[in-house]
Structure formats: C-alpha cells, structure tokens
C-alpha cells in the first residue's frame, strides 16, 4: 500500500536528522537530494495498470535455484516446459495435464514450479528444437501473483533480457468478480512479448466464477492443433491413460518413517521448528470455540488459536491458513466401496526419475492418511479424472457416460456441468451412482488433487492479542440436487474442535500466516471507512482493536466508521457486544448496521452508504479517508464500489466515467482496499 512508502521515507529522514553532525555541508546537500529523489520515486512513480504492486512475501523455501531447466530438458529429451503459478493447486494440475498431453504429438513435456528455477534461462530455450514454454498462471487476491510465482513476477519487472526466439503461450486462471481479473496471466503474456518472445497461441483466460474447467478444455483443444501447425508435427494418437506413478507397498516399514499428515518434513508435527509457512505449518491449540449467532439455521463461529512460542508474527488484515482434514466417515466409505485396506503402508513413486516431484503427496504413508489429510475428496472431480476412471467401469453405459463427460463435445460439456458440477458430486457420490466403477485405490489417489489450505481473514490485532490468532467463519452445509448433504471440509472440521481436547489430547490446527496488503493507514489520524457484512466483519474486529489500542497509548485516532450487515438483529449479528462497547467508548465513531430481513424491503450496506453520502464524501475527498471492503465479491463488493462511484459522481460533479476513474485511482493509491471472495 502507498503508506508503506511514506513510512520508509519518514524513517530515512529521521535517521538523517540524528546523524547530521557527522556530515559536511556538501554531504548534507547530496544526501538531501538523494532523499528527495527517493521520496519522489516511491510516492509518485506511476504504477503498472496491468497488475498492482504488492509486497513480496517471504517464505522458508530455499533460494537456491536448479542450475538450468534448459539443461535438464536437454538431458531428458523434452522440448515443452509448462510453468505454473498456483496457490490452490489448480494451475499446477492444468500444467501437469498439458505436459502429459505432449506425448500425443511426438513431444515430451515437463511441468515446472518457477520458484525452483532461474527464469533467465528462458533465453537459452531456443537451443532446443521445437521448444515451447507454456505458462499456467493464476491470479491471487487483488491482482497478485501466487506465492510461488512472486520471484518470477519480480524478475519480469526488472529484466531487460532479450527473449527473441523463445516461443510461448499463456493460460491465465482468474475470477471475473474480482477487480483485477486475470492480471497475472495478462501481465506475463504482455511482458514476454515486450521482451521479444513469440506468442504462438492466443492468451487463454479462465474464469473460476463461471466454469474454469470448461474454459481450460476449450482453450486446450484449440491450443494443441495450433502447436502442431506451428511446428509442423502431427498427433500420434488418441488421448490415452498413462500412469505417472507406480505403487510400492511397504510390508515392514518403521512407523517412525511413515508420514501421518505432515505437509513437509517427516515428524515435523512432533518436533516443531520455526519459521512456519505453507510447507511447515504450526500446530496451534484451539483455546476458544464459540458460536456467535443465536439462530439455528446457520452456525457462525469464533475460534482462537494459540501461537505462543511459535515466533509467528502477524498484523491486522493478514490471513490465517489452516490445513483441514476430511471427514473420517467419507474416508471409511471410500475404503469400503473400493474394498481396500486403508491402513496399508504404501508409496506412489514417480515413473519419471528425472522429475522434481517424486510423489503426489508425502510418502510413505497409508491410504487412510492420504485420503484424510492429503487428497481432495469432496470437490467435484475434473474431466481428466473422469476420463482416467472410465476404463474401470465394467458396465458399458457407465463407461460411455464417463467418456462423454470427459469429452470436449457440447453434449459432454453440458452433461458434466449438470451432473457433476451443479449437482456437486464428489468422488464418493460418483462411485455410489456408478456401481460398476471400481478403480484401484492407488490410481484414484494418483488422480485426486491435493487438499488445499483454507484462508481466513484474521479477526484480531496482534497489538492486543500477540499470542493468538482469531478466526470468524460460517459452517458450510447444504443439500445437493441429488439429495445428498454436503459439508464444508474446513468449517465442519473446525466446528468439531473442542478446546477441552479429547482423551487428554489438545485440539490442534495446522496453520500459518499469509501476509496481506489489507492494512490500516500508517497515520492513525487518517479516517477509515470499513464495509463488511456477515463474516466480512472479521478483519475489522482486528482494525478496531488496534485503533482502540492506539488510543490507549495516547495516540490521536481519526474517525472510524463501520458499515456492517446481517439478516436480523436477534439471529446473526456477529460480535454485537464487542462492537457496542467499541462504539460506547468512542473507538468506533459510527456503527451502522443493515438488517436485510427485519423489514419488508431489504436493506443492505450500500443503502446505508448512500444515506451517509455527504459525510462520506467529505472524509474521502477532503480528509483522505481510506476505504476497506471485505466479504462477497460477486454482489456486495461490486454494489459497494458502484455506490462509491455514484457518490463521487453526484457530490464531486463528475461524469460517470470520471467517477469510476476516481475510485480506481483510490485503489491504485492504496486508499480503497479489498479483501473479498466468491
């Protein structure tokens, strides 16, 4: 955010003042010029419009890169490399599918994590005949690259390397409900062209708010013919099932050498060592788990995780990620329907000995552990999984249906959309509905995607709660079109976490903190306008706690306004007592609550913003207020943004297009921040 630059400049100036006696007058003049230049550079340099600036996230991943992916490709006879920027595993999955496709065209592909290589090696790629670099790049949050693509993004911004002769294609993964739709994919595509690389197929833009799988299939089925035409090659055959991993059973393995749910280092949960991140989560004890709402229709909960002695540091506005576990009942049903012994110790070993990815998940382990902690068994499987599974259906009609849903035909796409996606059929439901489909459990484990961490906005301030992280979440449970009851993996698992523990064991949650740009202004006197209905209030609890703490430290604090929304005051008014107390003691200048179902005509937060438009416009236009919006991206965030545009147009005397630009400039300057999801 913009204020981080102001902070840096202010600190530098103070340091100069303290050291002034140590310099000559000439030194002082030169230093002043330098400070002035740096201040101008950081405060007024033009931001790139394609993708917003953001803070580099530090991780514990080794900074040592592989010597050369080009040399590795030469050594293994590959000519296509598919890089992926993936936060939830989907882009990595698409990259693996593309690299696997290559064999049909007499080519050999490899999927690669850009974090593991020096991308400057791209300039040497033309040394390989018919070489091609493909980039499956997801956009995370508000236009950010994924964590593993951060270094790649930084390199693209800084390099002037000549990439003439490099052939490339890009498929982006994004969500149209977000302001910066597919920013990373668009930026990579544009920047590679600027550096001289040759695009051989049009940029693909997948929309997760629509049907990301269909978007990818549509792009992919046009991509490969274009590759064949460009390089003058022909397809060698139909798509076929090729195992990537072989099953290895371990009869007498030492239990101490078997993974039991760890994400990275073996026994890391027994011997915890900081720093903690996605590959080394901290086991935090649940100290509080209480229901926030009064109604019985939904369960909204507040959890507190103990991070004492972890050395984990967080700031208000950051996200906490938790690794959940699948419902043991679902796991047992899968084992039963497949006739498998879930407690067999096994490994899935990559048949490609040169691959960096030796196993699809930590091995050796048991099927039970894999299905509980490592594999996603509750989301609808993608079409490539159905294609691979079809061979195991002994009933011809079931095999035909599976092949049809995995095809690129219009009828097949429609069937997949209605029968799998919209009906929310997970793998167990598909096995139940297709009685002849009984794949080997090891192949199923190879095909299923990894179970991903779930991210929540932290509902506390580290100034007030340095040793705990608070979570606010709604338990997900719904009936599908097929009449089944589906439950949210993480929220159902968290709901069952009893602070009292079980059988003398504490309730533990594997977690880590991901830094965010959703930050309070550097100056405490800056007014803040917070808009967060439902669980979108979570980060604002931390913001308000921090503003209260600043007041207690004797700091002057600017106006603090909250626009919160829920259904009814006696049903789902979250943190009601806490918010009332903050309002009473003056921390909250205004507490504005929209109850959508307490009157005939529904009232939402945007209606209250419109009601208060004169005061809000003064705070924004004259007093430099910062706006924060948290919650639903599809409807609420869009409606709130439109409301602020309308306020700017009406009270600022602007045309609609000018008002839209005005709000977008607030975003560019870090004065309009979003923490939204769809």
Swiss-Prot record:
Cofactor: FAD; FMN
Annotated FAD-binding FR-type domain residues: 279-521
Enzyme Commission number, as recorded: 1.6.2.4
Binding site for FMN: 86-91, 138-141, 173-182, 208
Transmembrane segments: 22-42
The record's free-text note on cofactor binding: Binds 1 FAD per monomer.
Residue sites binding FAD per the record: 424, 454-457, 472-474, 478, 488-491, 677
Positions carrying Phosphoserine: 63
Catalytic activity: 2 oxidized [cytochrome P450] + NADPH = 2 reduced [cytochrome P450] + NADP(+) + H(+)
InterPro entries: CysJ-like_FAD-binding, FAD-bd_FR_type, Flavdoxin-like, Flavodoxin/NO_synth, Flavoprot_Pyr_Nucl_cyt_Rdtase, Flavoprotein-like_sf, FNR_nucleotide-bd, NADPH_Cyt_P450_Rdtase_alpha
Record-listed N-acetylglycine modification sites: 2
Lumenal side: 2-21
Compartmental location: Endoplasmic reticulum membrane
HAMAP family hit by this protein: NCPR
Family matches, as PANTHER family: NADPH--CYTOCHROME P450 REDUCTASE (PTHR19384:SF17), NITRIC OXIDE SYNTHASE-RELATED (PTHR19384)
Function per UniProt: This enzyme is required for electron transfer from NADP to cytochrome P450 in microsomes. It can also provide electron transfer to heme oxygenase and cytochrome B5.
Protein name: NADPH--cytochrome P450 reductase
Organism: Cavia porcellus
């Amino acid at each position: 955010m913009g204020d981080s630059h102001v902070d840096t400049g202010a600190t530098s100036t103070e340091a100069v003042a303290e050291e002034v006696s140590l310099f000559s007058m000439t030194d002082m003049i030169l230093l002043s010029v330098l400070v002035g230049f740096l201040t101008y550079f950081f405060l007024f340099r033009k931001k790139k419009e394609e993708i917003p600036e953001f803070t580099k996230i530090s991780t514990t991943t080794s900074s040592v890169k592989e010597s050369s992916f080009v040399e590795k490709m030469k050594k293994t006879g590959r000519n296509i490399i598919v890089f992926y920027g993936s936060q939830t595993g989907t882009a990595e999955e698409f990259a693996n599918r593309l690299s696997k496709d290559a064999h049909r065209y007499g080519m050999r592909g490899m999927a690669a994590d850009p974090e593991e290589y020096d991308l400057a090696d791209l300039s040497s790629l033309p040394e390989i005949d018919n070489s091609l670099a493909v980039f499956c790049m997801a956009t995370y949050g508000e236009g950010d690259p994924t964590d593993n693509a951060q270094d790649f993004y930084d390199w693209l911004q800084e390099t002037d390397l000549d990439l003439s002769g490099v052939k490339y294609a890009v498929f982006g993964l994004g969500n149209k409900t977000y302001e910066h739709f597919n920013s990373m994919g668009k930026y990579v595509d544009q920047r590679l062209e600027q550096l001289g690389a040759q695009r051989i197929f049009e940029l693909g833009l997948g929309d997760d708010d629509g049907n990301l799988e269909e978007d990818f299939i549509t792009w992919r089925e046009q991509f490969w013919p274009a590759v064949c035409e460009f390089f003058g090659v022909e397809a060698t055959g139909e798509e076929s099932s090729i195992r990537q991993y072989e099953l290895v059973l371990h009869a007498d393995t030492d239990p101490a050498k078997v993974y039991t749910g760890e994400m990275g280092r073996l026994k890391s949960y027994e011997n915890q060592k900081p720093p903690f991140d996605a590959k080394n989560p901290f086991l935090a004890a649940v100290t509080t788990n209480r229901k926030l709402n009064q109604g019985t229709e939904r369960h909204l909960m507040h959890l507190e995780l103990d991070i004492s002695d972890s050395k984990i540091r967080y700031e208000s506005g950051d996200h906490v990620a938790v690794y959940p576990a699948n419902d043991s009942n679902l796991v047992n049903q899968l084992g039963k329907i497949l006739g498998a012994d879930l407690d067999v110790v096994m490994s899935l070993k990559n048949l490609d000995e040169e691959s960096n990815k030796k196993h699809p998940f930590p091995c050796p382990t048991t099927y039970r552990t894999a299905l509980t902690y490592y594999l996603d068994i509750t989301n609808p499987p993608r079409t490539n999984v159905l294609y691979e599974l079809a061979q195991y259906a002994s009933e011809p009609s079931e095999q035909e249906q599976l092949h049809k849903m995995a095809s690129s035909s219009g009828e097949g796409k429609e069937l997949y959309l209605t029968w799998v996606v919209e009906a929310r059929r997970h793998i167990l439901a598909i096995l139940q509905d297709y009685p002849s489909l009984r794949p080997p459990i090891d192949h199923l484990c190879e095909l299923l995607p990894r179970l991903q961490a779930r991210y929540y906005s932290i509902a506390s301030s580290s100034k007030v709660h340095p040793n705990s992280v608070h979570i606010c979440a709604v338990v997900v449970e719904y009936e599908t079109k097929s009449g089944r009851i589906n439950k949210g993996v993480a929220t159902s698992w968290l709901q069952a976490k009893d602070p009292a523990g079980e059988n003398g064991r504490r309730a533990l949650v594997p977690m880590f903190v991901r830094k965010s740009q959703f930050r309070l202004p550097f100056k405490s006197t800056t007014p803040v306008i917070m808009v967060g209905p439902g669980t979108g209030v979570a980060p604002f609890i931390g913001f308000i706690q921090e503003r209260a703490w600043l007041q207690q430290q004797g700091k002057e604090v600017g106006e603090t306004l909250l626009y919160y929304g829920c259904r009814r005051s006696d049903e789902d008014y979250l943190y009601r007592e806490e918010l009332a107390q903050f309002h009473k003691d003056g921390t909250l200048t205004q507490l504005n609550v929209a109850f959508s179902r307490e009157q005939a005509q529904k009232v939402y937060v945007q209606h209250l913003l419109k009601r208060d438009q004169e005061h809000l416009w003064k705070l924004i236009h004259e007093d430099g207020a910062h706006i924060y919006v948290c919650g639903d991206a599809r409807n609420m965030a869009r409606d709130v943004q439109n409301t602020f545009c309308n306020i700017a147009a009406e009270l600022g005397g602007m045309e609609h297009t000018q008002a839209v630009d005005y709000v977008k400039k607030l975003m560019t300057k870090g004065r309009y921040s979003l923490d939204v999801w769809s």
